[in-house]
């Protein structure tokens, strides 16, 4: 006995989803406004498990949303603002058509606006949630900040993105929060640690833009509108944590300039914005009352495991503090041909001082003739006169030193020298993975060991000698092993023949002197271990054995891939050596 019979597609998963057109009509919005609202609110389409049931038996391609998400959008106050804006555009078009200029001005003054503050608070209840979602916001804002002022994007949006990204970079410099840098084909990847949260973003290279035609800039502009609001909130909170003025104010401004601009901040004028964007000056801090020294925490005795963890944590913190002061006490000068903003940002983030030619950009703090300069970053060999006591290195030295957490030897980065490979700091090799020789050398440097590099000529000679020596030694060893095996077999045959002869003659067997055979304990232990492993596999259930075989197959595949990479590297090194030999043998 049941209730009333329900029609098909009126219960179950069919009632949990709604098509995009139905949702749009329910909200009374155009497709562009509906898409914009979904981006701002974080609503995205869902793919039903049984699409045919949800689509009422049809197999046509449709976009589905959860019905509860659309009901959630019904109460959004921005929807009314979208409708008001639609009416505003209609009235403005009508006023332009009738040439009623007073009406046009009045309508523009009363243009409907909306804020996204409540959406930010709704989507990110805590500040940590906002930091975890900051990667895409930073990448998009850095991209828009490099756009030219064309009709594709609003100029105000480009300027806002530039201001917010400069503010964030100044916070990273002040907090010494930068951890990793990587130069890729797409751009420069940065990783910073803010309040314990790793944040990774990418900035494009400073090349001229050619806007592609297959990109929907309206969708990107909607995302940027949301991300700029989010980044503004985050910057304000981060500046408060460090007691910095927000909007940022340059440190050491002249009193006359400060009085003339009383009540205004650094970003209110274009010249101050350029000085901030130079990243060469520090920010002014809010004067706070001196706080009492914190009381030292009593240390209580703990067990061995806890003390080992605390010791590891202490060492890690010490290494991190040392990493933050990597370039402290060093003065850099940047030549015209190097990427100024990226290098200035990285050097300042690790405590170094940086400057450039005054004619290149505003914000230079010292000239190239300064005798205190320790490193000059160049990318064109033989263009300047060398100064004694100054290292002329290529830009990659700065990036590699940051990733290595130490100042690398400058010999491999001199001007005109072929640079070593730029290793990614985001790759961590596991057991069985291929580790390139450069990474092994870097790990040895981090441990404080001497990599023991030899000159290439010495390496080649040693390899040739080793190859010849190895061939001779292998031949001698094989001959010795064969002789030993043949001798032992002959001795055994002679002993057995003597015993058989004694038995036939009826004599009592007598003890004969033999040779002492020493057992290889290591080999016996390996045999026992392999036997125990084989027995354990035999005792496994069918499902466990299948899982074990899959794990072992994955390990073997990883080893094969590592061996393949090692062979490729070996072939590459041999090709480089042969090319160098050919160059040496070629008559000039």
Curated annotation (Swiss-Prot):
GO terms for biological process: cell population proliferation; maturation of 5.8S rRNA from tricistronic rRNA transcript (SSU-rRNA, 5.8S rRNA, LSU-rRNA); maturation of LSU-rRNA from tricistronic rRNA transcript (SSU-rRNA, 5.8S rRNA, LSU-rRNA); regulation of cell cycle; ribosomal large subunit biogenesis; rRNA processing. Residues 306-415 are annotated as: Sufficient for interaction with MAP1B. It is found in: Nucleus, Nucleolus; Nucleus, Nucleoplasm; Chromosome. Residues 456-486 have a biased composition (Acidic residues). GO terms for molecular function: ribonucleoprotein complex binding; RNA binding. Its main location: nucleus. There is a cross-link at residue 517 (Glycyl lysine isopeptide (Lys-Gly) (interchain with G-Cter in SUMO1)). GO terms for cellular component: chromosome; cytosol; membrane; nucleolus; nucleoplasm; PeBoW complex; preribosome, large subunit precursor. Significant levels are detected in a variety of cancer cell lines, including glioblastoma, breast carcinoma, colon carcinoma and cervical carcinoma cells. Levels are abnormally elevated in malignant tumors of astrocytic origin. Changing residue 347 to R: Reduces incorporation into the PeBoW complex and nucleolar localization and impairs maturation of 28S ribosomal RNA. Residues 487-508 have a biased composition (Basic and acidic residues). Keywords: Acetylation, Chromosome, Isopeptide bond, Nucleus, Ribosome biogenesis, rRNA processing, Ubl conjugation. There is a cross-link at residue 517 (Glycyl lysine isopeptide (Lys-Gly) (interchain with G-Cter in SUMO2)). Residues 322-415 form the BRCT domain. Residues 1-257 are annotated as: Sufficient for nucleolar localization. Changing residue 327 to R: Reduces incorporation into the PeBoW complex and nucleolar localization and impairs maturation of 28S ribosomal RNA. Residues 1-54, 539-588 are annotated as: Required for 28S ribosomal RNA processing. Sumoylated. Induction: By MYC. The keyword Ribosomal protein does not apply. Belongs to the pescadillo family. HAMAP family: Pescadillo. Component of the PeBoW complex, composed of BOP1, PES1 and WDR12. The complex is held together by BOP1, which interacts with PES1 via its N-terminal domain and with WDR12 via a high-affinity interaction between the seven-bladed beta-propeller domains of the 2 proteins. The PeBoW complex associates with the 66S pre-ribosome. The PeBoW complex also associates with DDX27, PES1 interacts directly with DDX27. Interacts with IRS1 and UBTF. May interact with MAP1B. This is Pescadillo homolog. The lineage of its organism: Eukaryota, Metazoa, Chordata, Craniata, Vertebrata.
């Amino acid at each position: 006995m049941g209730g009333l019979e329900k029609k098909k597609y009126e219960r179950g998963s069919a009632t949990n989803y709604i098509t995009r057109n139905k949702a749009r009509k329910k909200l009374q919005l155009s497709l562009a406004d509906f898409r914009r609202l979904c981006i701002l609110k974080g609503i995205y389409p869902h793919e039903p498990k049984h699409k045919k049931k949800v689509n009422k038996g049809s197999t046509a391609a449709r976009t589905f949303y959860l019905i509860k998400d659309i009901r959630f959008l019904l109460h959004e106050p921005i929807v009314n603002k979208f409708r008001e804006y639609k009416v505003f555009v209609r009235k403005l078009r009508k006023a332009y058509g009738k040439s009623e200029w007073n009406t046009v001005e009045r309508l523009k003054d009363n243009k409907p606006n909306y804020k996204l503050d409540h959406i930010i608070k709704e989507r990110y209840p805590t500040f940590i949630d906002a930091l975890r979602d900051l990667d895409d916001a930073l990448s998009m804002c850095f991209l828009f900040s490099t756009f030219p002022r064309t009709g594709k994007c609003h100029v105000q949006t480009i300027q806002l993105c530039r201001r917010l990204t400069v503010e964030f970079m100044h916070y990273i410099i002040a907090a010494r929060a930068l951890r990793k840098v990587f130069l890729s084909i797409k751009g420069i990847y940065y990783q910073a640690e803010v309040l314990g949260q790793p944040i990774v973003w990418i900035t494009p290279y400073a090349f001229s833009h050619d806007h592609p035609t297959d990109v929907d800039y309206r969708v990107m502009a909607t995302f940027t509108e949301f991300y700029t609001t989010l980044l503004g909130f985050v910057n304000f909170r981060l500046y408060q944590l460090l007691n910095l003025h927000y909007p940022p104010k340059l440190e050491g401004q002249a009193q006359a300039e400060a009085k003339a601009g009383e009540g205004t901040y650094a970003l209110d004028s274009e010249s101050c914005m350029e000085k901030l964007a130079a990243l060469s000056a520090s920010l002014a801090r809010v004067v706070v009352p001196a706080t009492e020294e914190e009381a030292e925490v009593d240390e209580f005795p703990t067990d061995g495991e806890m003390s080992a963890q605390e010791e590891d944590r202490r060492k890690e913190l010490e290494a991190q503090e040392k990493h933050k002061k990597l370039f402290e006490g060093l003065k850099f000068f940047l030549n015209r041909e190097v990427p100024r903003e990226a290098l200035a940002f990285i050097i300042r983030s690790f405590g170094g001082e940086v400057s450039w030619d005054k004619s290149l950009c505003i914000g230079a703090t010292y000239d190239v003739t300064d005798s205190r300069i320790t490193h000059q970053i160049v990318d064109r060999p033989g263009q300047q006169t060398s100064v004694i006591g100054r290292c002329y290195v290529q830009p990659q030295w700065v990036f590699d030193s940051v990733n290595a957490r130490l100042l690398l030897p400058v010999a491999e980065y001199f001007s005109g020298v072929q640079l070593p490979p730029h290793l990614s700091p985001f790759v961590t090799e596991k057991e069985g993975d291929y580790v390139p020789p450069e990474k092994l050398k870097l790990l040895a440097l981090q441990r404080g060991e001497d990599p023991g590099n030899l000159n290439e000529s010495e390496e080649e000679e040693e390899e040739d000698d080793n190859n010849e020596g190895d061939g001779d030694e292998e031949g001698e060893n094989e001959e010795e092993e064969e002789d030993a095996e043949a001798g032992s077999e002959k001795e055994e045959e002679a002993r057995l023949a003597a015993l058989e002869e004694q038995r036939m003659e009826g004599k009592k067997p007598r003890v004969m002197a033999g040779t002492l055979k020493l057992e290889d304990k290591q080999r016996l232990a390996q045999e026992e271990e392999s036997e125990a492993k084989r027995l354990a596999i035999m005792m496994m259930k069918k499902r466990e054995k299948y899982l074990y075989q899959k794990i072992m197959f994955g390990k073997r595949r990883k080893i094969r891939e590592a061996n393949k990479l090692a062979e490729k590297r070996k072939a590459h090194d041999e090709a480089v050596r042969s090319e160098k030999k050919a160059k040496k043998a070629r008559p000039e």
